Amino acid sequence: MTILKWALIFLVISVVAGIFGFTGVSAASADLARILFYIFAAIFIVLLILGFTIFRA
């Protein structure tokens, strides 16, 4: 898999975690989902930058 495909996968994961975290599903899962959202959003941004710079085919 290319690095940009991984970046898109982490984007989808972060959006799903954001939906569960920011819509108020429950207090316990909302905190975990918010943390996961920020982690996967950061991974997405890093992989996106790497995909357009270092890992360009």
UniProtKB/Swiss-Prot annotation:
Protein name: UPF0391 membrane protein RPD_2934
Record bears the keyword Cell membrane: yes
Domain of life: Bacteria
Entry similarity comment: Belongs to the UPF0391 family.
Entry membrane topology: Multi-pass membrane protein
Record GO cellular component, one term: plasma membrane
Pfam families: DUF1328 (PF07043)
Membrane-spanning residues: 6-26, 35-55
InterPro entries from the UniProt entry: DUF1328
Signal peptide: none
Major site of localization recorded for this protein: membrane
HAMAP family linked: UPF0391
Alphabetical keyword list: Cell membrane, Membrane, Transmembrane, Transmembrane helix
Cell location: Cell membrane
